[in-house]
């Protein structure tokens, strides 16, 4: 009963139960650990080994995945990490799990005794056996590329004592005799090594190894055997036809060299039973299978790199190739390797020259008989880098490129065209000149290599006033009409002849390609008069548009790069000198010797520059006899001559005193150069986790190194933001009119007089370099290969 005598019922109006409180459940926190294992594997793949160790320490489940799944280690990145006693277990584990990069770096580290210290006693034998193990593993993991490990153990070998290269070769041979599978590529590598000896017995052994390798399915060995038998097969019509059928089979399976040979063989298609149309279709398929690769992506990956820096690097590589007389193919392959590496991995500016010379060392070993030795390559950089720096960069390049050294280049397609359509020698030289000029400009890479080669040929024929610059035969062979080539021809002409070449910090234009083709064997084709832009447009039948030269960065906008200052340089003038002052216009500077310097050096410099080349200078992996370190010693003496007594006394001596070690029965004397060490900016070190530690590799090479003694020019500052010089010319939007096939007159330009020949060539010596040298591809590198 309520108040006032009112009786309340228990209805909803009179009585209210307390409302129930609903408790909200907290949402479940999802973490990376809740992802399926397949998703976790995709996350862990391609991480650096330091990141993998850091993730491993986070949770027991992640630790279980890292420790028990080989795919994590097979894809781990060892970029900028070199084997050392502190991280050896990590490299070994990754290599055994199928990591190509770890296997390559371990093989090179043991072969050159770099980073992994081994006692002097039986060093070559121990290192050779270990290197052969990891080289064999790397070759098995090498999928889709030609066998490559032979380039590290190719001759020369030491003639006395134990040689690490020879130990690797014998160990691999013993392995092939024991194993019945996975031997084809190893047998090919063994055959390539023996084929480089001039001994007739070794040549026979090499052929036997190639035959065994071909029987086990090695396509490269099959092609080499075909090439060696080609001359004999051509004498018999029946054998010739059978040989051609084998070549077509090799080309259909993807052998690039076989595809090139097949296209060139179509020049004699009637002898092979081929009609003209069938021959043209084979060549046309090769050209149409070529695709462009966007080299502008280099600058999106390399934030500190611009087109001028790349131009300077390539110009210097051209100069080295000219000095060493390397082929155009070797030069083009070197540049391709540089660009492919720059698209995949970040490179500081001070290591660009190291990257370039490392790529040249690799490419000369892969395709040339005369090679660039490691010690000579170090000397060519003015000792900016040490011996071990170059060895490690070679490992970085080969692993980053997955062992794929040989790729299609512009010069390959150019050679096919010049074989199929005979032309005057000067037209051939001009076409080659244009192809090498195209290496300097990344904007021209917007065109496929085959397209660029065809455009270079068309421009060469136009320049030489051909009645029909682009014949129906050339159209049928390439699949490109004259109208298809017009944009590329105009771009090529603008970049090669209209735009100004960049200058170094000495205000000297970089013209190494032009100097290369001023040689008499090229009939001094680079001195020839060229068509003006207006004459070219008239010859092509297109509307002329005004063009402005694309400015390159000036010396005030960029640090000194791959060049040395001309200050404190002595020069001796001679009458009838072929090069009055080579140091004033070359990218890798030289200084002529004064009378005092010539007296000090005598004939030592001539011997050092001439002898240390090719096979006889390639003792870098085994050590050289005392006195065999040639060019760096000459640089040392002249550097001291340039210094005043006060400067000389104040300089610090190198930390690395001469400590000769025996390897392959020979000894090295380390070049001790007084001066400041070039600065190195170490990258961030990966974290240390669990029982594995990465650690910083403080171990130097077991072989004596050539010291770096280039001081850093840190006082220079960069200017404003660089402007890209790789834009296509405005003439790309064209009024395409029919191409008129009639002769055109050349532009009348002043031709510089030929310099007088020198009866007594000057002695030259390199000056010290006073400046610190400072993505994965979206397409498979086999993209340019013909698929039949």
UniProtKB/Swiss-Prot annotation:
Residues 29-76 form the F-box domain. Its main location: nucleus. Pfam families: Cyclin_C, Cyclin_N, F-box. GO terms for molecular function: cyclin-dependent protein serine/threonine kinase regulator activity. A motif (D box 4) lies at residues 351-354. The keyword RNA-binding does not apply. GO terms for biological process: cell division; G1/S transition of mitotic cell cycle; negative regulation of centrosome duplication; protein ubiquitination; regulation of cell cycle; SCF-dependent proteasomal ubiquitin-dependent protein catabolic process. A motif (D box 5) lies at residues 767-770. InterPro entries: Cyclin, Cyclin-like_dom, Cyclin-like_sf, Cyclin_C-dom, Cyclin_N, Cyclins_cyclin-box, F-box-like_dom_sf, F-box_dom. It is found in: Nucleus; Cytoplasm, Perinuclear region; Cytoplasm, Cytoskeleton, Microtubule organizing center, Centrosome, Centriole. A motif (D box 1) lies at residues 310-313. A motif (D box 3) lies at residues 349-352. Substrate recognition component of a SCF (SKP1-CUL1-F-box protein) E3 ubiquitin-protein ligase complex which mediates the ubiquitination and subsequent proteasomal degradation of target proteins. The SCF(CCNF) E3 ubiquitin-protein ligase complex is an integral component of the ubiquitin proteasome system (UPS) and links proteasome degradation to the cell cycle. Mediates the substrate recognition and the proteasomal degradation of various target proteins involved in the regulation of cell cycle progression and in the maintenance of genome stability. This is Cyclin-F. It comes from Bos taurus.
